[in-house]
Amino acid sequence: MTDLKITLIRSAAHRLPEQRKIVKALGLGRVDSTVVLPDNAATRGALLKIAHLISVEEINK
C-alpha cells in the first residue's frame, strides 16, 4: 500500500473558490505545509484539480 506526500508549493490565495476548498479539505494551510494521505481515487481526483499548486511524492509503506 502506498501513501502520497503532498506539499503546497504555491499559495491558494487569489485562486478559484473550488481550488481553495480542495486545498483546505486536504489539510494544507500555508505554503510548504505537507500532509500524507492514502493513495486512492478520491485523493487523486482532488490532486488533479490543484496540480499547479502542489508537489506530490509516493511513499511506500
Swiss-Prot record:
Listed under GO biological process in this entry are: translation
Source domain of life is: Bacteria
- A GO term, aspect molecular function: structural constituent of ribosome
Could you list this entry's UniProt keywords, alphabetically sorted. Answer: Ribonucleoprotein, Ribosomal protein
| Any single GO CC term annotated in Swiss-Prot or TrEMBL for this entry | large ribosomal subunit
Q: Subunit structure, briefly?
A: Part of the 50S ribosomal subunit.
Q: Which NCBIfam families match?
A: rpmD_bact
Protein family: Belongs to the universal ribosomal protein uL30 family.
Name of the protein:
Large ribosomal subunit protein uL30
